[in-house]
Each structure stands twice: as C-alpha cells, then as structure tokens.
Amino acid sequence: MNNARPIRRALISVSDKTGIVEFAQALAERGVDILSTGGTARLLAEQGIAVTEVSDYTGFPEMMDGRVKTLHPKVHGGVLGRRGQDDDVMAKHGINPIDMVVVNLYPFAETVAKDGCTLADAVENIDIGGPTMVRSAAKNHKDVTIVVNASDYDRVIAEMDANDKSLTLETRFDLAIAAFEHTAAYDGMIANYFGTMVPSYGENKEGDEESKFPRTFNQQFEKKQDMRYGENSHQAAAFYVEANPQEASVSTARQIQGKALSYNNIADTDAALECVKEFNEPACVIVKHANPCGVALGKDILEAYNRAYQTDPTSAFGGIIAFNQELDAETASAIVERQFVEVIIAPSVSAEAIEVVAAKKNVRLLECGEWTTKTTGFDVKRVNGGLLVQDRDQGMVSLDDLKVVSKRQPTEEELKDALFCWKVAKYVKSNAIVYAKGDMTIGVGAGQMSRVYSAKIAGIKAADEGLEVAGSVMASDAFFPFRDGIDAAAEAGIKCVIQPGGSMRDDEVIAAADEHGMAMIFTGMRHFRH
C-alpha cells in the first residue's frame, strides 16, 4: 500500500524564522496553499508569497494580545482529521484538511536567560497554540507532516520533488518523533523554571541554594552514538549529549582520526580535559581509569608532556593525553614514538601533527576548540532509583585564601607547588594524595579507603620511577583524621602539606607537621571526588 501523502495545504507559524521564507516559497512553487498567523504571515506576504491568515480562514480573529490564534476546530480538525474516516464530519463543518504543520515555539529559554526577566515576561513566552498544533500533527502523522526544525526544510522539499509532492510515512514518523522531542524539551524547561519559584510565588530567590534545584529535574539529551559496549563488554551503551553543550568539551570535540570512541575513552577523556583546563601555562594531563597519573607544566607542551609522562610511564601506557594548547608535530612525534595511547585531545591540532599521528591509525585524535569560561551547570550521579544533583566543583583557592598553620612558613616555591598540586588533587579519586615539585606531579595516590595508604602509594609510585620526593609538596583532597598520613609523608621526604583542615584532630596533625619541620597550609575547602 502506498503510504505517501501529498502536501496540498500547510500551516506555518514560527518564532524562529530562519529559512522560513525560502521554505514557504518552495512550498508555494509546488502548489501548496499556505495558512499562517501574526508575524509569520506578515513576513511571508511582504516577500510576495500568497498566504491566508488563519483568522480569515476560521472567521475568528486573533484575540487577547495574540494568546488565542490557532485554538479553533477548523485548525485542529484539519490537522487531527483522519483521512478516509473523518471526511464527512470535516465536510459538514467546513474543515479543510491541513497536510503539513510548520511550527517552532516561543523562545522561552532565551527569555528566562535574560537579565531582569520577570515572571510576567516568562509567562508571556509560554507557547500554548504552538505545542498544541505540534502535538496534534505528530499524533496524526499517519496523514500529516509536522516540521519543527529548520534543518529539515531542505530534506522535506527534496523528498517532495522525488515523490510527486508527497512525503512517505517513514519521513512523517521520523519528523513526528522530532516534534515530540521538541515539545518534551520545551515543557521540561518551563517545569524547571517554575519549579525553582517555590515556595514563594513569583520570586526566584537568587543565591538561595534551594532555588537552584527545581521540584522535578527535566533535561533532554540527544543520542550522539551507539557503542559496541559500555564499561564492560556485557553492557550495552550509547553516548548522549545536551542539545546545546558547553564549549570545549568531550561532547563537542571533533574526532580527526582513529577508532570510534569507547565508553571508557569518553569518561577518561572528559576527566583529562577538565583537569587540563585548570591551568593557564602550557600543561599536559595523562589520565588512566579516570585518574590523573601524570600532570605537568612546561615552557611549551612538549616539555609539559615529557614531564607528565615521567611521573608514571607504566600507568601512562594506554592512557588519555590532554593539552591546553595546540598539539604540534614535535609533541605528537614524542607521543607516538614513545608510548601506546588511546586518545589525544587538544584545543587545536596543527596540520603537521595530524600527519604525524596518522601513522598510528587507531589513535583517536580529538580537537575540542578553545575555552573561554569555566564549565558550569550541574554534576549528576545516578543511584538506584534516583539522581544526586549538585553544582560542579568549581571551587579553587588563591594565595590570599591560604592559611599557614605550622610554625614553619612555606617557601615561595612550595607555595607555587602547593597551588599546582591542589588543582590536580581536585581531579583524583578520593582518598586523593598528590606529591608535586616544580610544577610536576611526583606521585599520585588515588582511591584508597584510608588516606594514609594513598600517601604511601604516592611515595611508592615516585620511588618506582626514580623520582626524588625530598622537598616535594603533598596535597590532600580532604583533611587528615590522624597524624599517620603526615608521618608517612615525612618519611617519604615531603616538606610542605596543603589540605583543607577541619579535622577534630587538627592540633595533633599540625603538631606532627611541626615535629617534622614541615610547612602546613589549610585551604578551608574540600575536594572529594567519587
């Protein structure tokens, strides 16, 4: 059975008018009668396109400052009417079939994002007629085409030309899915906005922590790719991204070459990229299993890479490498000649570097673009039956925030290294201990159940690679509950410790630092990472 449906009459009413004149002109040239409303109708008429105002078609004027335009049986009957089943009742009431609906919705998200947006402003940008038409057309996709995205205009015209001015059921169904996704995202935005207003009607309590989190959590993600498997080979997986993801992220990165990114590749690349963003100087971060195993700064990214690699060459094998400056040919050569690597990501990649990496065709080479702002938004963790939602950890400290609690004052170099390894510790799984000296990690102890063992592991790692711990700084993502971690660090040769403080036994821990002649710095900020 032929499931194609000819397009003879279209209703067009759009807020985003990108490409709409050209699309309407193309429809008119193919003999399609056009109904339209308000500003869209005026725009089309001004461009010489024959258009019938919906109010002229229904015999009922727009009213209430445009709140009521298309909410009429002659409109929705024409959209919802089932061809071959409702023809008699449509004819009885003078309802003409509408074969295509072209609608996008009032710019609610853009409105509420503006400074000074009031509840009244938001309310007036809640579209009523638009979603109703979209859902009506999508529901009746067996007979009606719904178009909500300007990116589909060319596709629709091309299929009409190839199919005697008709569209297939497969296309109508695909467009209907896009329509339901569109209205779901729209309603989710409205629910989120209003959900932050409670309990005080009309008052978005800026700065009130509770007001950040709506009563229901509505976010929409688009599937970017299906994967061979997930974290393990027996788990099915796919990668979803936000409709408008932030700049310079693993979600927006362009893959220049290499095999498809795996589930673990994406998770590890995200960890590496977000860590390297912390630094302004040329920096390299090497990640394995979501933990930094080597981080360093340098006069250029080649030096930064060489120093980061020295921290833990064993763990760097099969790792993810991130840079905060353009990948050049010399650095690319150093990587591919020295080690097996899964992913390399940088803001940009030179043409010469692309040629170098091409010799290793399986290496995934990504270009993420420059970043100008900190990553914002929510951090979301799935638990059985629920979500944990929090602000992203953007907390950092400066020299002015540091409190020296030991008898010995840290040297200028120790202060510099303290801030460096404090940034790194933020990205290491708790319990996290980082040893660093000269803007280079010396040892990393990650993910241990006791902090003292993380400290011991950092020392063991450094010793295994022949790196000198003496004179290094130690960062801890949380306070030391006992002095044993300080004793272990002193035994390894640590001379300065940076940590949040806040333990019931801070006095005991500080006393241990004084006994060992260490400098100890409190940040007053914790960086748990689970």
From Swiss-Prot:
One Pfam assignment: AICARFT_IMPCHas
SMART domains: AICARFT_IMPCHas, MGS
UniProt KW keywords: Hydrolase, Multifunctional enzyme, Purine biosynthesis, Transferase
Keyword Cell wall biogenesis/degradation listed: no
Catalytic activity, reaction form: (6R)-10-formyltetrahydrofolate + 5-amino-1-(5-phospho-beta-D-ribosyl)imidazole-4-carboxamide = 5-formamido-1-(5-phospho-D-ribosyl)imidazole-4-carboxamide + (6S)-5,6,7,8-tetrahydrofolate; IMP + H2O = 5-formamido-1-(5-phospho-D-ribosyl)imidazole-4-carboxamide
Gene3D superfamilies from the UniProt entry: 3.40.140.20, Methylglyoxal synthase-like domain
A biological process term (GO) from this entry: 'de novo' IMP biosynthetic process
GO cellular component terms attached to this protein's record: cytosol
CDD domains for the chain: IMPCH (cd01421)
Single GO MF annotation: IMP cyclohydrolase activity
Record remark: domains: The IMP cyclohydrolase activity resides in the N-terminal region.
NCBIfam families assigned: PRK00881.1 (NF002049), purH (TIGR00355)
PANTHER family linked: BIFUNCTIONAL PURINE BIOSYNTHESIS PROTEIN ATIC (PTHR11692:SF0), BIFUNCTIONAL PURINE BIOSYNTHESIS PROTEIN PURH (PTHR11692)
Family: Belongs to the PurH family.
Protein name: Bifunctional purine biosynthesis protein PurH
Species classification: Bacteria, Pseudomonadati, Pseudomonadota, Gammaproteobacteria, Vibrionales
